[in-house]
A protein has these predicted regions:
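Class I S-adenosyl-L-methionine
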Residues: 1-264
């Protein structure tokens, strides 16, 4: 079972060199990702401490955190565990803004020659951290005009305008959440049990779902598809990207979806 590291040490914020070493270990940037789904684009990943629910006092916990998140299984899980290693040493003092600042530094170090998937692992759970990364994304795009895109479970606490020019989709777990996320200014992605085919799917409140083209085989990867890089356009058309449960924790995800649907 995937779990976040047990907190065994609490301390005051250490000296700046130690802070730098610890926070740097919680961030990774790739000029060209080896992730087959997103394709040969740039990407960043950060510790799950940045996710809603990564700390006990977070007001909302991501449904899939330590409960089937795709980032916790298979080869990706190895990288995620590495990013989480320092959690016991920083949780007493590290803030969401700290992690976002170090992810921004990692983003700044990339060439900007390719589209960039922001935090394949990780999230922004408050407005300040989203603004820090939106500014870094603007610098990234200014280099060669390439888009920075991502998904967020933090949409309940962070309105869309804090993300600036980032193409960001609200990660929703039920159809009832689509209207709420839309009201926050977001285009949406919805996790579903499975895809029947590649056809548009009617959803609640006038939304329509597009089965992820990579998952249904009509596009090779995210780079060749590009739909999630057009989040505001998707919102304007009330189109929702449907992402079928996948990864090593797929059974847990499907169980969570079923439970959430029964409570709607």
């Amino acid at each position: 079972m995937f779990t976040l590291p047990v907190v065994t040490a609490h301390s005051e914020r250490p000296d700046s060199a130690t802070v730098h070493a610890l926070l740097s270990s919680m961030v990774k940037a790739m000029e060209i990702s080896a992730n087959g789904k997103i394709g040969p684009i740039s990407a960043t990943s950060v510790s799950q401490l940045s996710c809603p629910g990564g700390q006990s006092d977070d007001p909302y916990r991501c449904t899939f955190l330590c409960a089937g998140c795709y980032a916790e299984g298979n080869m990706q899980g190895i990288h995620t565990r590495a990013l989480n290693t320092a959690i016991p040493l920083v949780i007493a003092w590290a803030t969401a803004e700290d992690i976002a600042t170090y992810e921004a530094l990692a983003l700044d170090a990339l060439t900007g020659k390719r589209p960039c998937r922001l935090h394949v692992v990780g999230d922004c759970k408050n407005a300040n951290s989203a603004r820090i990364l939106s500014q870094a994304a603007a610098r990234y795009t200014a280099k060669h005009g390439q888009v920075v895109y991502t998904y967020t479970h933090g949409w309940r606490q962070v309105s869309r305008d804090n993300w600036g020019g980032v193409s960001v989709l609200a990660s929703c777990d039920s159809q009832s959440e689509l209207k709420q996320a839309d009201a926050q200014g977001y285009g949406c992605a919805l996790v579903v049990d499975h895809h029947d085919d590649s056809k548009l799917v009617p959803l609640a409140d006038g939304f329509q779902g597009i089965p992820c083209p990579e998952q249904v085989g009509t596009k090779e990867n995210c780079k060749s598809c590009g739909l999630c890089m057009r989040a505001d356009w998707l919102k304007s058309k009330k189109l929702v990207i449907l992402l079928a449960a996948h990864g090593q924790g797929v059974k847990k995800v499907k169980a969570s979806l079923k439970e959430k649907a029964s409570n709607d």
